[in-house]
Amino acid sequence: YVAIGAQGGRKAGVPGEDADGVKTGVEFLRSVNLDESTKLSGRTVVVGGGNVAVDVARAALRAGSGEVSMFCLESRDIMPAAKDEVAEAEEEGISVNNSWGPKEILTENGKVKAIVFKKCLSVKDADGRFNPQYDENDLMTVECENVLLSIGQSIVWGDLLKGTKVEI
């Protein structure tokens, strides 16, 4: 048995996510926790609606971002983050925007300029499987300098199991 945790962040699979100014939430939190000199400036958009996304948004504010907004697929009533965590984030000035999913990240000279969201109509299908449905005609563009993707975590195995008989 090997338990290493899910230390990698997931990307959204949208155009522009490799631009300068885009990081995964866990990558950002790791840099904040390991190096207190991590700073942000300008406007930050956090994509995600779980507790980690709330932590990322609050850390972004503390790292110097002038304005922090969260956007998630879920409506407020099914948002996975703890209600008290969301309330505390809002008390700190973080805006929470429900039922929006990323469509693309707009760039200029390789840097984040804005993120385009599309309205999320539902997150799961009739069988309860993750299968977001969108209104591709209901779009919102949010200007920002930083995008922090906090939409899930992944395992980064690297060479950890190289030379072992452990099967995945």
Language model features with spans:
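N-terminal Rossmann-fold NAD(P) dinucleotide-binding loop
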Residues: 53
